[in-house]
Amino acid sequence: MSSSTQIRPIAVVGPTASGKTAISLELAKLLDGEVVNIDSMQLYRGMDIGTAKVPPEERQGIPHHQLDIWPVTKPASVAEYRSGAIATVEEILSRGKMPIIVGGSMMYIQALVDEWDFPPTDPIVREKWQRELDVRGVAAMHQYLATIDPEAARIIEDNDPRRTVRALEVIELTGKPFAASQPPKNSTPRWNMRLLGLSAPAEWLNPRIEQRVRQMFDQGLVEEVRSLVADGLARTSTAGQAIGYAQVLDYFAGELTFEEAVDRTITGTRRYARRQRSWFRRDKRIIWIDANSPDPVRAATEALGIVSQQ
């Protein structure tokens, strides 16, 4: 790649456990690329096992960016991520390299791909809604959200306290439905980026999710969470609400048995994968390949019109 103006970054998206990491590594090797993470929980330092973060020794010498940049005590910020990720991609392009953007965090991907004026924030308003949720519970607050903004309630899971609070905050601050503040879909992507999606039907993906979750617990997820608690991880933090981490924290609190924590992590991950499939399917710019194809890397290169030089 001799000129950054000729390079169209590639984003590899799709549900969790569909094989995005493996394909991104192969594409990076094929295209002289560097990987840019767009998984919101992989931004946190120390959250390795439960986020399926690629260990340094398995990165095959390929530079990885936007990993391990936040402490677990920091509230997540899509706007802050976008600013840093744009700078990272621009720097990679300036060196004539191919950015391979990979992950499944829907809002983060949307923010990087599309031009988006973020809705306002107000810590006082957010704290008000957070206190209300702490008293009434997430299910009741989600039900309230459904009465004032049915579309917001449709796209936000009824067990997602953070997004429920954020929607109520935005509605109060803007006086408009939450969806009105969401980014446009299907416009020309930033950098004329190519979007590659891994299609993974539930009957194929669900066993992979269970296998991955059980492997995470076998590899030491409980010990990882225990060490992060010493660093300030708490159930009230963004990081502490991550699937797997929240369940282990409940296990520590005596609210779940070990096996219940495992089972709820599996269930929560499957629900999240359903949301991801639904979200990405609405984006008509995505080029889809079968995650279960005999040679997904070849399918990816053919779908993207990439001719191997090897």
From Swiss-Prot:
EC number: 2.5.1.75
Molecular function GO terms recorded: ATP binding; tRNA dimethylallyltransferase activity
Any one GO biological process: tRNA modification
Subunit architecture: Monomer.
InterPro entries with a match to the protein in the record: Dimethylallyltransferase, IPT, P-loop_NTPase
Site (Interaction with substrate tRNA): S105, R126
Catalytic reaction equation(s): adenosine(37) in tRNA + dimethylallyl diphosphate = N(6)-dimethylallyladenosine(37) in tRNA + diphosphate
Top-level division of the source organism's lineage: Bacteria
Protein's recorded name: tRNA dimethylallyltransferase
Binding locations of ATP: G14, P15, T16, A17, S18, G19, K20, T21
Biological role stated in the UniProt entry: Catalyzes the transfer of a dimethylallyl group onto the adenine at position 37 in tRNAs that read codons beginning with uridine, leading to the formation of N6-(dimethylallyl)adenosine (i(6)A).
Region described as Interaction with substrate tRNA: 39-42
Family, as annotated: Belongs to the IPP transferase family.
Cofactor(s) required for function per UniProt: Mg(2+)
Any Pfam family: IPPT
Disulfide bond sites: none
Residues reported to bind substrate: T16, A17, S18, G19, K20, T21
NCBIfam families documented for this protein: miaA
UniProt keyword annotations, A-Z: ATP-binding, Magnesium, Nucleotide-binding, Transferase, tRNA processing
Class of this enzyme: transferase
